Design a protein with these regions (language model features):
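Amphipathic, small/basic residue-rich leader segments at the start of a protein or domain
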Residues: 1-88, 109-116, 245, 265, ...
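Glycine-rich beta->alpha junctions and the first turn(s) of the following alpha-helix
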Residues: 2-5, 195-291, 353, 360, ...
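Glycine-rich phosphate/cofactor-binding loops in nucleotide/flavin-utilizing enzymes
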Residues: 2-5, 69, 73-74, 93, ...
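C-terminal helix-coil-helix/basic helical segment that borders enzyme active sites and/or dimer interfaces
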Residues: 28-35, 268-275, 286-342
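Internal helix-loop-helix
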Residues: 49-108, 112-118, 159-165, 285, ...
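A short, Trp-centered hydrophobic/proline-enriched beta-strand micro-motif
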Residues: 117-125, 169
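A structural signal for short hydrophobic beta-strand segments in well-ordered beta-sheet cores
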Residues: 139-142
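A short core secondary-structure module
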Residues: 146-147, 151-198
Length: 383
């Protein structure tokens, strides 16, 4: 959005655009709600066969090994056609973590199925008493010989009832101080005995999230990632990837297109005041794209994102909410309906888009927590 393609990049963009037009099912285009894995995986498999499912992964692990600019081009073209987000927990979260911290055996076991789309991953972080204050987690894992015994509960776990594996933070030393020092990073087979999964109906009407209960679940010791009690350090590395993924400008670009579609249909596009607000929103989306590209470049160079991950999480999530507020304004009275609105310019599900945007400032670290991080780490304020 803020740069010009080289001739080679322009050719690559046209290749991506042409292939997406020919291969992305119409039923998946422009979907406001994230399709469940059962609907999404055929598209995932098609991208995998093309070699495009993981542009940011190195070739040695089955990825595309794309340059930064190629990754940006793919993000823009996926947004342009309204492609749905792929399951992020495998591609953007545990995959990069295993590349950095996993054993050779863990990489060999788990990375190829992520690329192939034969295994779906869930993230086991939040608990009923530990959300933004994640260090308060209480799910216990006791090492007994060559295995751990896990007891406890996770909540707000995305697509757990469709997943095969979970990466989770568990408490292995309840006496450790600070609390972060007693946390370990484990891989759990969700088909193991003692695991119960209960979907949660959300305000948007979907059941994307679940509660997960662990009743004396046996986890082999070789499923430990990194060292015992060192999970917090790994989790911090993962949070950088997660905040990058949740602030991907693809979502903002798609929201901007929904606003334009709705504004043309309602007639408000001719209003100068609305045009001014839309222009300001477009500038913010361009700024997010620039910030995202900078963060991706640091990440690709193996550098820690540090405070940048908090900055992009705040800006990206709050911008998405602001865009959906503008979508409500563009829809006018039509925003009161609880079903997609058919227009001459395409279908827009205004209510679902608005409701789903409410949670983005909470998951992955709330805006309040991120501002505290910036206050401490950038401004050197106490707390």
């Amino acid at each position: 959005m803020f740069r010009h393609d080289t001739p080679a990049e322009a050719d690559f963009r046209m290749d991506v655009r042409t292939w997406l037009e020919a291969n992305l099912p119409v039923a998946l285009r422009g979907r406001t709600a994230r399709p469940p894995p059962v609907e999404l995986m055929p598209w995932y498999h098609k991208l995998s066969r093309k070699g495009w499912v993981a542009p940011h992964w190195p070739r040695q692990h089955g990825g595309m090994g794309a340059t930064l600019n190629e990754q940006i081009i793919m993000t823009e073209e996926l947004a342009r056609i309204g492609a749905p987000q792929l399951p992020a927990q495998g591609l953007n979260h545990i995959g990069p973590i295993l590349m950095a911290f996993g054993t050779d055996a863990q990489k060999a076991q788990h990375l190829p199925p992520i690329i192939a789309g034969t295994v779906i991953w869930a993230q086991g972080y939040s608990e009923p008493g530990a959300g933004s204050d994640l260090a308060s987690l209480s799910t216990r894992a006791t090492l007994e010989g060559n295995h751990f015994v896990v007891r406890g509960q996770k909540i707000w776990t995305t697509w757990a009832h469709h997943s095969d594996w979970m990466f989770a933070l568990v408490r292995t030393d309840p006496q450790a101080q600070p609390r972060q020092a007693g946390i370990t990073f484990l891989l759990l087979d969700l088909h193991s005995p003692g695991i119960r999964i209960r979907p949660i109906k959300t305000i948007a009407g979907d059941d994307e999230f679940s509660e997960v209960f662990f009743d004396d679940v046996i986890v082999p010791a070789e499923n430990l990632v990194g060292k015992l009690h060192d999970g917090w350090r790994i989790a911090n590395a993962l949070l950088g990837h997660e905040r990058l993924a949740t602030s991907n400008p693809q979502f903002a670009l798609m929201a901007l297109e929904r606003i334009k579609t709705m504004a043309r249909a309602s007639g408000i596009m001719a209003d100068p005041t609305f045009q001014e607000r839309l222009a300001a929103a477009s500038i913010d989306v361009t700024a997010l794209s620039a910030l995202f590209s900078h963060a991706v470049e640091l990440n690709n160079q193996g550098q820690s994102l540090g405070p940048e991950s908090s900055m992009i999480k705040i800006f990206g999530s709050e911008l998405l909410q602001a865009l959906n507020d503008l979508l409500i304004e563009a829809a006018g009275g039509h925003a009161l309906t609880d079903r997609p609105i058919a227009t001459d310019f395409g279908e827009v599900d205004v209510a679902a888009s608005f409701l789903q945007s409410r949670r983005v400032t909470i998951y992955g670290g709330s805006s309040e927590i991120q501002r505290n991080v910036l206050a401490r780490r950038v401004l050197n304020l106490p707390g």
